[in-house]
Curated annotation (Swiss-Prot):
Residues 302-519 form the Histidine kinase domain. Signal peptide: none annotated. Residues 235-287 form the HAMP domain. PANTHER family: HYBRID SIGNAL TRANSDUCTION HISTIDINE KINASE C, TWO-COMPONENT HISTIDINE KINASE. It comes from Mycobacterium tuberculosis (strain ATCC 25618 / H37Rv). The chain crosses the membrane at residues 42-62, 213-233. Residues 1-15 have a biased composition (Basic residues). This is Sensor histidine kinase MtrB. GO terms for molecular function: ATP binding; phosphorelay sensor kinase activity. One of its GO terms (cellular component) is cytosol. It catalyses: ATP + protein L-histidine = ADP + protein N-phospho-L-histidine. It is a multi-pass membrane protein.
Length: 567
């Protein structure tokens, strides 16, 4: 028996599961529709408020009608019982030869016979009569009619000499249901004679039920009409708003000629006119900005190309002088070194301007080949390693033991890494810089982590802006132009990859480059976290299969050979 009951309970739960899920899905759908549909909210609120008003009004009107009907019934009953008391007094005082019970029964029969319509029924309608003389000592009480239907509270008032009435539910031979019972003491030769009239409220109840039904039907019809009116009225407002939303979306997509139709002179028409004026102004400004941007890019490209030829000539002359600087006096030798250094910086600026103009014009192209990215990282380290040695900064390198083959433009990826490492050295505050690489089936990631000044909130986006610097007064050992990270993020996007930054003041910063292993694939996740371990390991990370460090990594080179790649 126990196991059987468990199976039944489990079956009931199994059947309730789909119902619960269905109700949950329905509630979510209703919640979504409520949040997204202004028309639904307007109609629902209109129906809710209208329903509250109709219920309140219906309650008040029903109460008024009920009280009015019952008041008429009570006044008619009072008139009826006054006439009945006179009739009873006449019958009881008429013949002394009749017994008390006979007199009471005769009086009751006389009263009830008057309720026949043919004999002139009272205004209060049909009723039943109860006559009673309470017992006194050894004498028993004398009654006529259904005395047990008279409430004790009402009998107490009548016994005290007061006329009173009360609503009660009675059950007699000819009627069962709510009734009005009115009682009064009667003056006659029989002391303490009490008269009660029972008036059925069937017709009044039917009238009240009819009124309530009529009001409910009218309220329902009115509610439906109000819903339709609210739907139509809200549609007059929602349709133009939806049209404006669709046109705004198309405008945001680049369809600058989209405009709202103007109909009439009402508020919606003024909204359409204002929207069209705004769209016209925005389209003009966008066109002007696009034209200005094109001119700016063309100017940058033209200037960069025009300066290339004289710069090459000056470079050749400077190199010739530099090669014979040993024969010059110290002052001229130092001037030659400064001239070569500034030419390196100027050439780097031209190269960066040319590269950023290619990205702006959309003509930058990838030269994709399958390469081992570990070699690319080592090449980048070899080109900027001398900056770390000069600053006394330790580079901690953690590369996979196996090859990491990816389809990338090795030149652009190496440039990204050089910019990131040089930027980390500039901001490391003589603390170690960690370079890590990891790969999975789809993506490869390289992080460059420093433990220096870090980034303030919001600067992780600004750091990729052109010519932006967190602290303009900081001395940059890499001699960057301010375009390195801007070019790097464009190179990463060209690979359909991501270049992201994270930092906290005083905790350092981390730049993460994530690239797809296969050209054309999109990056969705990264094998390396954005937030590295906050405390650096001061010893170099031991590689499972250490690779020999390129000789140029320790060799101090001329600054101009690396200035092109500094950020």
């Amino acid at each position: 028996m126990i196991f059987g009951s468990r199976r039944r309970i489990r079956g009931r739960r199994g059947r309730s599961g789909p119902m619960t899920r269905g109700l949950s899905a329905l509630s979510r759908a209703v919640a979504v529709a409520w949040r997204r549909s202004l028309q639904l909210r307007v109609v629902a609120l209109t129906l809710g408020l209208s329903l509250a008003v109709i219920l309140a009004l219906g309650f008040v009107l029903t109460s008024q009608v009920t009280n009015r009907v019952l008041d008429i019934k009570v006044r008619a009953a009072i008139d009826q019982i006054e006439r009945a008391r006179t009739t009873v007094s006449g019958i009881v005082n008429g013949e002394e030869t009749r017994s008390l019970d006979s007199s009471l029964q005769l009086a009751r029969n006389t009263l009830t016979s008057k309720t026949d319509p043919a004999s002139g029924a009272g205004l209060a309608g049909a009723f039943d009569a109860v006559l009673m003389v309470p017992g006194d000592g050894p004498r028993a009480a004398s009654t006529a009619g259904p005395v047990d239907q008279v409430p004790n509270a009402l009998r107490g008032f009548v016994k005290a000499g007061q006329a009173a009435y009360q609503y009660a539910t009675v059950q007699t031979e000819g009627f069962s249901g709510p009734a009005l019972i009115i009682g009064t003491p009667t003056l006659s030769r029989v002391a303490n004679l009490e008269l009660y009239l029972i008036f059925p409220l069937a017709s009044e109840q039917a009238t009240i039920t009819l009124v309530r039904g009529t009001m409910a039907t009218g309220g329902l019809v009115l509610l439906v009409l109000l819903a339709g009116i609210a739907l139509l009225v809200s549609r007059q407002v929602v349709v133009p708003v939806r049209s404006a939303s669709r046109i705004a979306e198309r405008f945001a997509e680049g369809h600058l000629s989209e405009r709202m139709p103007v109909r009439g002179e009402d508020d919606m028409a003024r909204l359409a006119v204002s929207f069209n004026d705004m769209a016209e102004s925005l389209s003009r400004q966008i066109a002007q900005l696009e034209e200005f941007g094109n001119l700016q890019r063309r100017f940058t490209s033209d200037v960069s190309h025009e300066l290339r030829t004289p710069l090459t000539t000056v470079r050749m002359a400077a190199d010739l002088i530099y090669d014979h600087s040993a024969d010059l006096d110290p002052t001229l030798r130092r001037s030659t070194e400064l001239m070569v250094s500034e030419l390196d910086r100027f050439e780097t600026l031209l190269n960066d301007l040319l590269e950023i103009s290619r990205h702006d014009a959309g003509v930058a192209e990838l030269s994709v080949e399958a390469v081992d990215l570990r070699t690319t990282v080592n090449n980048a380290l070899g080109n900027v390693g001398h900056l770390a040695e000069e600053a006394g900064i330790e580079l901690l390198v953690d590369l996979p033991a196996e090859q990491v083959i990816a389809e990338v433009d090795a030149r652009r990826v190496e440039r990204i890494l050089r910019n990131l490492i040089a930027n980390a050295i500039d901001h490391a505050e003589h603390k170690p810089v960690r370079i890590r690489m990891a790969a999975d089936e789809d993506t490869v990631a390289v992080t460059v982590r420093d433990y220096g000044v870090g980034l303030r909130p919001g600067e992780e986006k600004l750091v990729f802006s052109r010519f932006w610097r967190s602290d303009p007064s900081r001395v940059r050992r890499s001699g960057g132009t301010g375009l390195g990270l801007a070019i790097s993020v464009e190179d990463a996007r060209l690979h359909q990859g991501r270049l992201e930054a994270w930092g906290e003041p005083g905790e350092g910063a981390c730049f993460r480059l994530t690239l797809p292993m296969v050209r054309g694939h999109k990056v969705t996740t990264s094998p390396l976290p954005m937030k590295p371990i906050p405390q650096p390991v001061l010893q170099p990370v031991a590689q499972p299969n250490p690779q020999p460090m390129p000789p140029e990594y320790k060799e101090r080179q001329r600054p101009r050979e690396h200035a092109e790649w500094s950020g």
